[in-house]
A protein has these predicted regions:
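Conserved histidines in hydrophobic membrane contexts and catalytic metal-binding motifs
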Residues: 29
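Catalytic core of pol beta-like nucleotidyltransferases
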Residues: 1-26, 34-36, 40, 51-96
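Short beta-strand->loop micro-motif that forms the acidic, two-metal-ion catalytic signature
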Residues: 45-47
Length: 96
């Protein structure tokens, strides 16, 4: 996956599966993938929220996303982001 549009389309196509298997309620792209500095070496920054508490499923979800997107994924939980960091990334988040 090498551009925002392609990544968005892929995430939209697999979102029903992610909702069912991993209890995903929200996915948001941020970081270099939504800015002009995304490169072949960049990872994909994804913020996720869940409809119920998860444990090891978080790691399984990260692995699944890396497999589906064929690129390293930096997955962060919405609830795990400190407010000052969320405030910094919020303007650039693109929800899928």
């Amino acid at each position: 996956m090498n551009n925002l549009s392609t990544i968005q389309k892929k995430l939209l196509s697999i979102k029903p599966f992610l909702v069912t298997k991993y209890h995903v309620s929200e996915l948001g792209l941020f970081g270099s993938v939504v800015r002009d500095d995304f490169s072949p070496m960049s990872d994909i920054d994804i913020m996720v929220d869940f409809s119920r508490p998860v444990g090891i499923e978080f790691i399984d979800l990260a692995d699944e996303l890396e497999r589906q997107l064929d690129r390293k994924v930096d997955l962060v939980s919405r609830k795990g982001i400190k407010p000052k960091y969320f405030d910094a990334i919020q303007p650039e988040i693109i929800y899928v």
